């Protein structure tokens, strides 16, 4: 009972004086439930917990899937719909596309571990479709960087998350980061959280 009525995981859970779900729901945080669960299993080999929480992980991806348009691109949500970073004026659509691909692959791995071939194949197809769309519509050949939103914004978050998602190979990713650092786009990074992912990429 620690989710929204539709099953979405909240961005925050208060534990004192009793368990209370925060009313802030951020799509990237919800998707990371599955990625975190996968990482937890890989560190602990706790199959029972993996199995118990797998349905919740699957549900987060189902909810996120509703946010895509006919081109398989992430639509801009209403209000404070995703975190990504505190950068003012940050267009988050391409970064969120990357988070979705990244988490779909993690949830695919969960399904494979649990022997759910149907769910694993579904997540594999989702990741492939969203990756193809990112390459077709979000990669700007002129700058050699990913762009985001109607304004075709170039920001750190889009590059980082689409690289971490595996939308490009490691060599291409390195080239993108080199171009990014050289360009120094206006929309940089604010939080240690985002800087950590930049280093990881």
Regions from the PLM with identified roles:
Residues 1-201:
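Active-site core of glycosidic bond-cleaving carbohydrate-active enzymes
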């Amino acid at each position: 009972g620690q989710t929204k009525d539709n099953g979405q995981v909240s961005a925050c859970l208060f534990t004192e004086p009793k368990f209370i779900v925060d009313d802030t729901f951020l799509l990237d945080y919800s998707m990371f439930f599955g990625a975190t669960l996968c990482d937890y299993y890989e560190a602990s080999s706790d199959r029972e917990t993996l199995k118990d929480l797998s349905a919740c992980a699957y549900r987060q991806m189902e909810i996120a899937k509703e946010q895509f348009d006919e081109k398989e691109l992430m639509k801009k949500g209403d209000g404070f719909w995703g975190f990504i970073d505190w950068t003012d004026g940050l267009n988050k659509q391409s970064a969120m596309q990357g988070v979705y691909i990244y988490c779909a692959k993690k949830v695919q791995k969960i399904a494979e571990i649990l022997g759910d071939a149907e769910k694993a194949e579904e997540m594999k197809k989702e990741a492939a479709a969203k990756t193809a769309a990112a390459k077709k519509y979000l990669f700007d050949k002129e700058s050699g960087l990913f762009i985001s939103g109607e304004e075709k914004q170039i920001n750190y978050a889009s590059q980082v998350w689409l690289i971490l998602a595996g939308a490009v190979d490691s060599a291409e990713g390195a080239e993108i980061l080199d171009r990014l650092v050289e360009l120094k786009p206006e929309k940089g990074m604010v939080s240690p959280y985002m800087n950590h992912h930049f280093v990881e990429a």
